Amino acid sequence: MGWGNNYFRTPLYPRMGIQQTVFEKEAFHRFLTDYTGALNGCAGADKTWNRGALASEVRAFYSEQATEYGYTSLRDWQQVKKPLVNPLYSAVGVLGFMGPFFCESQLNTDLPEIEYPFTLAHEMAHLAGVTSEAEANYWAYVFCRQSKDAAVRYSGYLGLFVYAASNASALLQNDELVAWIETLSPVVLEDHRSIQEFWQGKRVKAIDNVQRWMMDRLLKSNHVTEGAHDYFGVIAMIMTMDAQIGTEI
């Protein structure tokens, strides 16, 4: 139950003494250009990581970096666990889950390897005390992009793809959106398509709808005002942090 107190902590921006960057189209264009170049640059990278070593790297990252911003370091004994009812996780499209009562992070065992690094880092961010889904995405992205392993970096960039595409759809004119899509590597588009089809094939719509409603209510009742849409705030957070404290943190 103690983990739930994290919902009452001061948000990241005030804690760091910075203001959120104004989300302007020109600034988003710059972000999108840099992001797309990095995404394409490591698309198709061969996997060289293993899960045990990757988990150790994630723990070390949070212990060295996130503690500077008020979060807790992670111990060697803190491991992600397997859900007891994994088919239910897949039926509702949940890739991972933070259990607040026993402070345990769980990962869906059906996760494709390409999604594993980003999702692992996201769930371990929660274990370090991060409650905002946007911020957990932010920390997961920062971990992945600083990795020396191109496949880990790709997992991070691909993990952001749905959020970048959503913002692009909202901010760009149709011809600009089409032009951006044409700059994407065919490997990226195929990986995104295969991931979407993989999870769609496991979803049970009725259960999924109930889970989404419950998640939205849970987050809103715990001071996450955006509810389930909080995940999408990661792009604004990346633009703010990169502009005000630099890409290396």
Where are these regions (language model features)?
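Membrane-interface segments at or immediately adjacent to transmembrane helices
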Residues: 3-66
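A generic secondary-structure signal for well-formed alpha-helical elements
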Residues: 8, 12, 39, 43, ...
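Second-shell loop/turn segments in exported
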Residues: 19-22, 45-52, 106-110, 121-128, ...
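Auxiliary, metal-adjacent structural segments of Zn-dependent hydrolase domains
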Residues: 41-109, 113
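Solvent-exposed, acidic/flexible segments
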Residues: 55, 109-117, 129-133, 150-154, ...
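Active-site recognition of the HExxH zinc-binding catalytic motif
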Residues: 118-137, 141-142
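Active-site/pore-lining binding-face segments in mid-to-C-terminal subdomains
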Residues: 138-190
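Pan-zinc metallopeptidase signature
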Residues: 187-249
